């Protein structure tokens, strides 16, 4: 597991109040982890802060699973 993958899973668990062991790469934030739209906005903000990148709204809407978040950070993290 990469450092980015570990960090993303930790942030997801903290933001959504779930056990880190329950955060799988294929987990959907809304369907599997119980996030609502406000949770996902806060999650994106936490990812932006943690990785020092900006995630435009049109991209944030497409990040619906843990793996998509990991892929986005890997592609856009300096």
Swiss-Prot record:
GO biological process terms held by the UniProt record: lipid A biosynthetic process
Pathway: Lipid metabolism; fatty acid biosynthesis
Pfam families: PP-binding
Changes after translation: 4'-phosphopantetheine is transferred from CoA to a specific serine of apo-ACP by AcpS. This modification is essential for activity because fatty acids are bound in thioester linkage to the sulfhydryl of the prosthetic group.
Keywords: Cytoplasm, Fatty acid biosynthesis, Fatty acid metabolism, Lipid biosynthesis, Lipid metabolism, Phosphopantetheine, Phosphoprotein
SUPFAM superfamilies on file: ACP-like
Segments forming domain Carrier: 2-77
Localization of this protein: Cytoplasm
UniProt keyword Lipid biosynthesis, yes or no: yes
GO molecular function, a single term: acyl binding
Residues modified as O-(pantetheine 4'-phosphoryl)serine: 37
HAMAP family in UniProt: Acyl_carrier
NCBIfam families: acyl_carrier (TIGR00517), PRK00982.1-2 (NF002148), PRK00982.1-3 (NF002149), PRK00982.1-4 (NF002150), PRK00982.1-5 (NF002151)
Family: Belongs to the acyl carrier protein (ACP) family.
Protein name listed in UniProt: Acyl carrier protein
Organism: Neisseria meningitidis serogroup B (strain ATCC BAA-335 / MC58)
């Amino acid at each position: 597991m990469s450092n980015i993958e570990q960090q993303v899973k930790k942030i997801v668990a903290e933001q959504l109040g779930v056990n880190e062991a329950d955060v799988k790469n294929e987990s959907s934030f809304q369907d599997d982890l119980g996030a609502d739209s406000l949770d996902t906005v806060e999650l994106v903000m936490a990812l932006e802060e943690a990785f020092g990148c900006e995630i435009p709204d049109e991209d944030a809407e497409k990040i619906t699973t843990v793996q998509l978040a990991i892929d986005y950070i890997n592609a856009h993290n300096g």
